[in-house]
Each structure stands twice: as C-alpha cells, then as structure tokens.
Amino acid sequence: MKQILFIFLFIYSLNVQAKVVLPTIYSDGMVLQRNQPIRIWGQAAPKEKVIVTFAGQQQVVNANTDGHWETRLSPLKEGGPYELQVLGKENQIEIKDILIGDVWLCSGQSNMQWVVNNVTNAEVEKKNANYPQIRTLNVPRRMELVPIDTINAKWTVCSPETVGSFSGVAYFFAKKVHEETHIPIGIINSSWGGTIIETWTSLEASNSISSEHLNCYTKEDKLLSPTKYFALKNKKAARNDYPSLVYNAMIHPLLSLSIKGVIWYQGENNVGNAEPYTDWLTCMIGDWRQRWKTELPF
C-alpha cells in the first residue's frame, strides 16, 4: 500500500512540475508600466514551449534546462483592460483586467505602512474610494539573508470595500495623480515599521559605505556574509541587525516589474545615527536606479 501511494505521489508531483507557472505578482487587476518593455516570466518543464499572448502581441519561448522562461513584450501606452494568456503543454493561465499606466513603488517604515483604516475621517474616505483604476500590491513583510525572486502577493483593485488596507500615503498620492492625469495608477506597498535604511540597501551597495558607518553591525565583520551567517550557532536575526535583510525579500523580487518611480518615507529609526544617513540614502537611491536600469524619480 505504501509503495502504491509513493508511486501515485511521484506521478502527481511530475504533473504539477510540468505545468507552466507565473509568479503571483502577475494576477488579476495588476497594473503594468506604460511606455516601457513588459517582462513576463515564470517556470515550466525544462525545454517546454511557452506561448505568451497579450494586447495583440504574441511571443513563443522555450524554458531553459532549469525550467525558467521569460520574454519581453513591446511597450504600450496607457489603457486596458487587457488579458494575459500563457499557454504551456499541460495548462493555460489567464490573467484578466490588466491596466497599463504608471506604477509607483511606495517604501519605507511605519509612516508608509500606515493604512487608510487609521487615517482621519477614514469612513468618509473609504465610502468615496471608488477608483477602479487605482490598484495596489502589498508586499509581505519578511527578511532574507540572500536575495529571493518571488513574493506571495496579488493585486487589489481600489474600492470602498478594499481601500482600508491600502497604505494611506500611497493611496492619497495615487488618488491625486490619477485625478490629475486620468491614467491608471499602480502602487506597490513595500514598507515595514521600525526599519532602518541600511536594511533596505543591498549587500553589494553597502560595501561602498565608509567603514566607520558600518561599525554598529558586527565587532569582527563590517558586513555579515551568507557563509558566515549560516556558520553561526544562533541564526536568529532581526530585520535591522544587518544591511540588506529586508532588501533581499521586499525589493529584489520586484526588479522584474518596470516602475515609474519611488516614494520613500523613512528616517525616524535612523534619528539616533543621523550623520551617515545622507551617505546611506545616496547609496540606496543609486543602487535601486542601477538595478531598475533607469533614473527613477524619488
């Protein structure tokens, strides 16, 4: 009986792995950045042919030996809604109600994390929040020692029923821009209360910071490498213990999405060590711009 069960589970796992898969950030109601190439990627069986269809464009790609595949579609002007279809050998994925507009990354600590439910006159704001062309993606708050590529999050369309969980700063920004431009607005809320700027900065960029500004992290090492971390007996670490921990989990997975710019609301937790903040902010902004390959407005 156990042998039969094992064979069944093995065959089932092969069928699951053979299906084409998209990251969850490609979900119903998403907003893609206008006037920039659109990157679509996912997983499939090794060497599997994948057909991607979107807004009158179609691309055929083959997954590599690891099952990874990706393609880029031509830029589009603002508009929609569109439907994304991804066809593999075993299954087809359909993502609906996609808009093309401006996508803003909204990041920082508690002031950015503060939700509409907690603002002054919240009930009035929620009652009037009928903005179907404003959508948000709330990035889960977590940290990782090394950069990861995916997050478990889906887009949410703004409505009186949903807006309460939107970042207040991000929502009021999106509302103002949308009312002025009449362009769909996507807001990616990647924020975490109590964080310092260092944890939002990649490890590579942190290495460019003056050594005198890194003394607060470890006595023996200015930066803790993944190898040294895994060698520790006690692997417990808080989000502010070392540079890059939050960047790895909450910024790096977003690099596949083109964005218009960044709203940054952070600094309170660096007030006790304000002198090097200018260096860290300059470093982080430069690093994010380099990774998105554009001079993002902050």
Q: Model-derived features: where do they sit?
A:
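Cell-envelope and extracellular/periplasmic
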Residues: 19-298
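Positively charged n-region of N-terminal signal peptides that target proteins for export
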Residues: 1-4
